[in-house]
Amino acid sequence: MTGCIVGWAHTKFGKHEGVELETLIVDAATGAMVDAGVAPVDVDEIYIGHFNGGFVMQDFPASLVLQAHNDLRFKPATRVENACATGTAAIYQGLKAIAANQARIVLCVGVEKMTELNGAAIGEVLTKASYYREEGGENGSFVDIFARIAESYFQKYGDQSDALAQIAAKNHANGAVNPLAHFQKDLGYAFCREPSDKNPLISGPLKRSDCSPVTDGAAAVVLADTTTAMGMDKAVLFRATAHVNDFLPMTKRDVTQFEGAAKAWHQAYDRAKIGVDDLDVVEVHDCFTIAEMLIYEAMGLAEKGQGASVIADGVSTKDGKLPVNPSGGLKSKGHPIGATGVSMHVMAAMQTRGDAGALQINGAEIAGVFNMGGSAVANYASILEAVR
C-alpha cells in the first residue's frame, strides 16, 4: 500500500462528560480537513474506527462523520472494527482504497466514548475483545487476561516487577508534558513500583499503574495518494504497513511471546527495507506495561525473556537510543479504543515533521507504530517518514 498522511486532528483524551459521540467525531473530522487544507467536497471516501460493543447506545456511526460539513453528504462512509486496533484498521482501509485507485483523498476518524458506563459494565464490554467462552464473563476481565500473560512470563523468566514499574514511570513522565493526554502527572518510579492504597494490585502482579485508563476521545487523519500529497503543505509517507492476525484463544498460543506482533514488525521492516536500528522513535500499544515489554522483544530490541533490559538500560526513554511512547502511550495518554490507532499515527507523524512540541525527539525522521487488538491477536505495524 502507498499513501501519505496529509493532515490530522486530535481531541484531548480524558473523561468528556456531557459531550456526545458525534461531537467528538465532528470535531476531529473537521480539524483534520482544515489541517490538511482539504475541502470536504474533495474527500472521496470516509472510514471510521469505532469499537463500541455497548459503551454507548449509538451504533452505526459512519454517517455521523457527514455532520462535519454538508459537502460530505452522499460520500461513501464505512465503519471499521478490529478490537483495540480498530483505528489503524480504519486507516489501512483508507490506504487500500487509494492503492486500488478507488480514492484520491480519504478521511479516517477514530473515536470512542467509554466513560458513560460503570466499571463492571466497561469490563464486560472489553472482554468481548477476547475469546469470550474461555477468557470473558465468569472467566475474568481484560486485566485478568494480561495478568495471566504477566504471570506466565514471570514464571518462565523471573519477576519483572521492576521493569514494569520503570515502563509505567517512563510513560507517565512523557505524558506529563502532552497537553492531549488523559493523565498529565509524573508518578515516579517509587509510586509505580510498590502497591499502595493509591496504587493497589488489580490482578496478579499488575497494579493500577500498570493499566491504561478508560478514556473518551477522537483523532482523525486525512490520507492522500503520493502524487496528490506532494502538492500539499505536508506529507508523511507510509513506507510500509503490515497486518497479521493470530489465533484468538490464548490456549492456542504461547502467551509469553507476541508472535503475531513479531511477524508484523518484521514484515514492515522488510517492506520498508530497514531494520529496527533505523527507527528514530516508536509509538506502541502499551495497554498494560507487560504488553510494552513483550513488544520490545517482538520488534527486535531484545531477545525472548530479555525485554526488561530495554528499559533498564534506558534504550526506550525519551533520551535513549530508541524512544518508545514519547506521547505517554496508552498508559498516560489514554486508550479510547477506536481512537487509539489513529492517535498513535498522529503522534508519530508529528514526530517525523518536527511538529511534536514538548514531545519532540530530536532528529526523528523514521517512526514506527504498533497497534494491536486483543492480546496480540490483530497486529498492525506501520513505518512512517515525512516527505514534505
Can you say where each PLM-predicted feature lies in the sequence?
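Extended C-terminal subregions enriched in glycine
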Residues: 258-262, 266-289, 293, 298, ...
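Condensing-enzyme catalytic core mediating Claisen C-C bond formation in acyl metabolism
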Residues: 1-22, 165-167, 201-263, 267, ...
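Buried hydrophobic positions in well-ordered alpha/beta secondary-structure cores of metabolic enzymes
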Residues: 6, 32, 43-46, 87, ...
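Beta-strand segments within the central parallel beta-sheet cores of soluble alpha/beta enzyme folds
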Residues: 41-50, 76-82, 106-111, 162-169, ...
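Conserved active-site "lid/cap" helical segment
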Residues: 1-85, 149, 153-160, 182-192, ...
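Conserved catalytic cysteine-centered active-site region
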Residues: 4, 16, 52-109, 113-145, ...
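Active-site-proximal alpha-helical scaffold in enzymes
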Residues: 81-112, 144-178, 221-227, 333-356
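Short glycine/threonine-rich loop-to-helix capping motif typified by GTGT followed
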Residues: 53-61, 250-254, 286-308, 320, ...
